[in-house]
A protein has these predicted regions:
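N-terminal intrinsically disordered/low-complexity leader segments
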Residues: 1-10, 17
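Short, hydrophobic secondary-structure boundary micro-motifs
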Residues: 106-108, 121, 147-152
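Short amphipathic alpha-helical elements of helix-turn-helix/winged-helix folds
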Residues: 18-22, 97, 134
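Hydrophobic alpha-helical connector segments
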Residues: 60, 74-104, 154-161
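Helix-turn-helix
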Residues: 14, 18, 22-56, 60
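Amphipathic alpha-helical packing segments from all-alpha helical-bundle domains
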Residues: 67-71, 118-145, 155-163
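Short coil/turn segments at alpha/beta junctions that flank glycine-rich nucleotide-binding fingerprints
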Residues: 25-29, 80, 101, 145
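Amphipathic alpha-helical segments used for helix-helix packing
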Residues: 99-119, 170
């Protein structure tokens, strides 16, 4: 990794840490972009290179961890388990992760509704799609094993399951 790339990663990490600290200490509404930039020891323009607004900063804080948690969650279901048990295994990982950071998790859950634009949006939407695709595969496998009887497409069922899960988080 070049020195320039390393400096970018260090800057990104300082911004993530500063935003997480200030959101936790002062609250999402009270923390300002200017305070976050100052705490991260970067200029306001540099901060805006990484996140368009505070909402985007929330996803800068969470995307990397959420991606790793989703990897773990999708590896949890065991072949042969009932679909419900597999789904519980997937969602349990996410629930535990969110429970470990209640203040920041509340902010994330408030801000993720309709989040579709911003510098971090594509990454977040990709993670969410990967989770829905994983649920779809579990549903498809259950259909093929004749463990669930439905003519609905696995993709439709997976989206409904995901939306119920999302609603339960709020």
């Amino acid at each position: 990794m070049s020195l320039r790339e390393r400096k970018k990663l260090e800057t990104r990490e300082r911004i993530r840490a500063a935003a997480a600290e200030l959101f936790t200490r002062h609250g999402y509404g009270a923390a300002t972009m200017r305070q976050i930039a100052r705490r991260a020891h970067v200029g306001l323009g540099t901060l805006f290179n990484y996140a368009e607004d505070k909402r985007d900063l929330v996803f800068l804080i969470f995307n990397e961890e959420l991606n790793a948690v989703t990897d773990v969650a999708l590896a949890e279901p065991r072949p042969g388990q009932a679909l419900l048990e597999q789904l519980m295994a997937v969602f349990r990982v996410h629930y535990r992760w969110l429970a470990g950071k209640p203040v920041l998790a509340r902010i994330l859950l408030q801000e993720l509704t309709f989040y579709s634009s911003g510098k971090q949006a594509a990454t977040f939407l990709g993670i969410r799609k990967r989770l829905i695709d994983g649920i779809e595969q579990l549903v498809r496998n259950a259909q093929e094993r004749r463990k669930i009887a439905t003519r609905e497409k696995p993709a439709l069922i997976a989206r409904h399951i995901f939306f119920v899960y999302s609603a339960s988080l709020r």
